[in-house]
């Protein structure tokens, strides 16, 4: 999905020739320590321009380099599950969770089929998150 990082007034995103020229800087040419180098700095991450998931990311601590994690980011902790892609943004997700909690709801079977039996909105999977982050280069 399309996404962007917004640090101050500067936007960083994937290069896309169809997007407005000069709108964003190429995210592949920058490292996090260059654009958010200090503790307490914050920036926004917008994921999926259709659903428009906005995340405020705050640099809470800067750790010394660890040879085990060279070349990719590492998540140290988190809360709750990621909403599924293309669920209609925050309001669509809230609607899904409401349907999920009511087996008598007419859309219950469809929502459960989409989410799968394993989905638990209250569980954050740190190991899975870091496996995904490991693939980012």
Give the positions of each predicted feature.
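Short linear regulatory motifs enriched in tryptophan with gly/pro/ser
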Residues: 1-137
